[in-house]
Amino acid sequence: MATVDHREAGQDDPESEDEVYEVVDLTEYARRHQWWSRVFGSNSGPIAEKYSVTTQLVMGGLTGWCAGYLFQRVGKIAATAVGGGFLLLQIANHSGYVQVDWKKVEKDVNKAKKRLKKKANKAVPEINTLIEEATDFIKKNIVLSGGFVGGFLLGLAS
């Protein structure tokens, strides 16, 4: 943080006050005041500073297992719905109920791919900031993150 003394030229009046401005570096402020401090209060911080390694592993493992298990269940339901929809579409097409112009479908899909690639190349700065915050969180809480990944994989397998 720095201060800047601002005086107008030609003002030698003893009654005039010097204006002092405080320059705040917002990037440094944002690094010192993480998002969890704004959400959970000033007593919150990295989990590594509050809990033992064993507690972090158990917390990460349990939350990871729950997330993996739910991801597996929802994924199976979604895959069944999408696959069933394609199967019904093929049966309807084969039976003559539906006529699909596959060349037009392919053309539209390729057009959508090109648009998506163009938009993906123009990364939004907010996404980069979010990725930096997530990476910083993982680095500061590596034990918890490792437990989460292990639990997530176990949840997918169960």
Curated annotation (Swiss-Prot):
Pfam families with a match to the protein in the record: FUN14
Subcellular location: Mitochondrion outer membrane
Renumbered ranges of motif YXXL: 21-24
UniProt superkingdom: Eukaryota
Record keywords, A-Z: Autophagy, Membrane, Mitochondrion, Mitochondrion outer membrane, Transmembrane, Transmembrane helix
Claim: Transferase is one of the keywords in the record: no
GO cellular component: mitochondrial outer membrane
Family annotation (InterPro entries): FUN14 (IPR007014)
TM stretches of this protein: 51-70, 77-98
Membrane topology per record: Multi-pass membrane protein
Keyword Metal-binding: no
A GO BP entry: autophagy of mitochondrion
Main localization, broad class: mitochondrion
Purpose of the protein: Acts as an activator of hypoxia-induced mitophagy, an important mechanism for mitochondrial quality control.
PANTHER family linked: FUN14 DOMAIN CONTAINING, FUN14 DOMAIN-CONTAINING PROTEIN 1
Similarity-based family: Belongs to the FUN14 family.
UniProt-recorded name of the protein: FUN14 domain-containing protein 1
UniProt source species: Tetraodon nigroviridis (Spotted green pufferfish)
Primary gene name: fundc1
